[in-house]
Amino acid sequence: ICNKFDNVKNTFFIDNEDCETTIDNEPNENIKDNNTLEDDYSKIIIAKKDKTIVGFISIYLIDESTAEICGFVLPEYRNNNIGNYLMEKLSYEMEDFYISIPVAKDNKTAPNFLRTNGYYPSTTECSMVINTDNIVEKPSSFDCSFDFKKTENENEIIFEIFKDNNNIGSCFVSIFETCGCIHNVEINEAFRGNGYSKLLLQYSLYDIKNICQNIVLHVTKENVPAYNLYKKLNFITTSEIIYYDNL
């Protein structure tokens, strides 16, 4: 969802075969009882004024249960409830489906628009980064009662932490040309709450500090322990995306 005063030239290509629904028509009823998206499902809901397309919502089918939705209204036609009409049609068309819409934190237009149409914030996803020059903890300073294992695959490294020969957790690091990306950080449930994830991450970060300049990760703010841990490890939040759901 774009900001109100975006100074951007936009070009869209719309196939007439996909334009099956307009805001002047009754919503179609192609949704099946088994909650799957069918190949004949309406791809675009369009709004016209004097035979000119002034806005639309497109539904790109990814698979039978997933779709990517894009909405746009020409700037000169905004504030005329066209977007609300389109969202109303969309909500009717997809009333049996869960819809989650990502919005940048600095977007001042989208939140009110979405709330008006029955979408409310559920989670906030943060992108975080650390420059490897800021990683100074040395493995020699770690508790010697722990063992670490490193497994290298193509473009990916797996780190594991052991205590008394028990595997208590692991994390994955994907290696790209410009950065590394930490993901799938997990401590076995019986060992959580003891600071083991911090030890695992410190070891992993120090090991890869000479491989890439920056290391990134994604975490939801609602995952308070993980979010606070990354901040303690000097990760900096670079962007936030708020997800609005049709609750």
Where are these regions (language model features)?
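Conserved beta-strand-loop-alpha-helix junction that forms the acyl-donor binding cleft
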Residues: 100-111, 217-227, 243-247
